[in-house]
């Protein structure tokens, strides 16, 4: 029984000799950063965006709580978010949040949505919410933030 429990606990970490997760970024997609209309910013640096998604910045100006919504596992948006913003593999992302919650630096990991449509609906409804969307499929009713002064259509946009 103990061996089974240990195997189950260690399985997500990868066994010795197994290949690590690779960050695979889908070609051609550009991530747009979308937020609730009341979020008091229009432009973030990539460093500020990382702090938000890593849980190091938990409030917008005026004490509005940041609510991070991440795409579903396996989606193109999630793959690009992990590679460009988190700079982590799926496994590293999970371990990061387990450790952060264990150290009581966060109450929980970002909320994972079941679909990008649900993410858009929640961003519209939840004050302080921030998420991502394929820049070619921006949902109506959300605020699109610029990153490093650039929109997703601009040359040199960092999230492609």
Describe each region flagged by the PLM.
Residues 1-3, 140:
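Generic structural signal for short, solvent-exposed loop/turn connectors between secondary structure elements
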Residues 3-12:
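Sec-dependent N-terminal signal peptides
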Residues 13-17:
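C-terminal segment of classical bacterial N-terminal signal peptides
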Residues 20-160:
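Exported/periplasmic ABC-transporter solute-binding proteins
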């Amino acid at each position: 029984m103990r061996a089974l429990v240990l195997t189950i606990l260690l399985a997500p970490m990868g066994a010795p000799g197994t290949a690590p997760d690779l960050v695979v970024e889908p070609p051609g997609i550009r991530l747009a950063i979308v937020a609730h209309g009341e979020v008091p910013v229009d432009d973030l640096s990539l460093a500020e965006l990382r702090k938000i998604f890593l849980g190091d910045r938990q409030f917008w100006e005026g004490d509005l709580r940041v609510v991070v919504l991440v795409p579903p596992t396996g989606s193109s948006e999630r793959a690009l978010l992990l590679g460009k913003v988190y700079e982590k593999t799926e496994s590293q992302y999970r371990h990061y949040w387990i450790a952060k919650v264990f150290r009581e630096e966060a109450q929980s990991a970002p909320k994972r949505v079941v679909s990008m449509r649900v993410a858009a609906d929640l961003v519209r409804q939840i004050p302080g919410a921030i998420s991502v969307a394929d820049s070619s499929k921006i949902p109506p009713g959300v605020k699109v933030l610029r990153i490093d002064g650039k929109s997703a259509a601009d040359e040199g946009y960092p999230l492609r």
